[in-house]
Each structure stands twice: as C-alpha cells, then as structure tokens.
Amino acid sequence: MKTPKMNVESFNLDHTKVKAPYVRVADRKKGANGDVIVKYDVRFKQPNQDHMDMPSLHSLEHLVAEIIRNHASYVVDWSPMGCQTGFYLTVLNHDNYTEILEVLEKTMQDVLKAKEVPASNEKQCGWAANHTLEGAQNLARTFLDKRAEWSEVGV
C-alpha cells in the first residue's frame, strides 16, 4: 500500500530506513525577498526503537538553544521533535551542511563542559523541575561519539 504524500516533510520520510544518529536537510524555503530558511533533522535516537527521556531532552534543548548561538548567528531555532528522537535546527540564509556539522560538534562539546542547564528555573521555563544536566550531557556525548556517522542517513 502506497502512503499518501503529506504536507509535512518528515511524514514522507520512511522512518524504518534511517540510521540514527544523523543530520540531514529536512526542508528549504525561499522567501519572497530572497531569504532562505533551512531546516535540519538532527536525529539522536533510532525511530521506533529508542527515544530520549524528557528531562534529558528538555535540558539538551535549553543547553543547545543557548550555546549554539555562540557559534552561529544565523540560527533561528532549535526545537525538539514530539517523538523524542531528535531535534530540528532551523537556520536563516546559511546553506553550508559541512559548517552546520562543525557548529553542532562545537556546541555538543560545550554542552559537555556546562556546569548548569540555562534558564532551568520557574521564571524562565514552563517545567523547571524537569531537567537533568547529566542526562543532557550523556545525550551529547553519545551523539559526539558517532560524529563520523552524522552524514549517513541511510535512506
């Protein structure tokens, strides 16, 4: 049975054929004024086989969202996938895949050096009790350990 074409790019991805961890271009959009938005699928866990626990995912979201901007001014957003297997990295007017991998590598290395999860308090976070620095660092370490495989999506 053929799956119908969906509006959401990731719904058209055959999740049974990917090999996490990986980083792939999920979408490109060109604006009316020439701006280009590129969305990357940054997959940490194998779909339908493993997932990140919420406190670790939540903490890694905070850490990367804050730290990645030290390495790249063109970052628009770093947001978690609802399936808890990865994140989306959205950038503006920057379409250099190799550089994105380098920025992600530097960011994850900085996550390993972090002493606290940024903005993990009730004033700055909607679920402040749901954080673990150690869990986030374990995710970053595991992702970095497979750095040589990030370009191997498997599709």
From Swiss-Prot:
Lyase recorded as keyword: yes
Q: What are the GO MF terms of this UniProt record?
A: iron ion binding; S-ribosylhomocysteine lyase activity
* Keywords linked to the UniProt accession: Autoinducer synthesis, Iron, Lyase, Metal-binding, Quorum sensing
Instruction: Please give the superkingdom of this protein's source.
Output: Bacteria
User: Where is coiled-coil annotated?
Assistant: none
Q: Does the keyword rRNA-binding apply?
A: no
Which Pfam families does the record associate with it?
LuxS
Q: How is the cofactor bound?
A: Binds 1 Fe cation per subunit.
Entry EC no(s):
4.4.1.21
Q: Which Gene3D superfamilies match?
A: S-ribosylhomocysteinase (LuxS)
Positions binding Fe cation in this chain are H58, H62, C125
- Kindly list the residue ranges recorded as spanning the membrane: none
**Similarity comment: family membership:** Belongs to the LuxS family.
Q: Cite the record's note on assembly.
A: Homodimer.
HAMAP family membership: LuxS
The record's function comment reads: Involved in the synthesis of autoinducer 2 (AI-2) which is secreted by bacteria and is used to communicate both the cell density and the metabolic potential of the environment. The regulation of gene expression in response to changes in cell density is called quorum sensing. Catalyzes the transformation of S-ribosylhomocysteine (RHC) to homocysteine (HC) and 4,5-dihydroxy-2,3-pentadione (DPD).
User: Which PANTHER family does UniProt cross-reference here?
Assistant: S-RIBOSYLHOMOCYSTEINE LYASE
Protein name (record)? S-ribosylhomocysteine lyase
Lineage of origin: Bacteria, Pseudomonadati, Campylobacterota, Epsilonproteobacteria, Campylobacterales
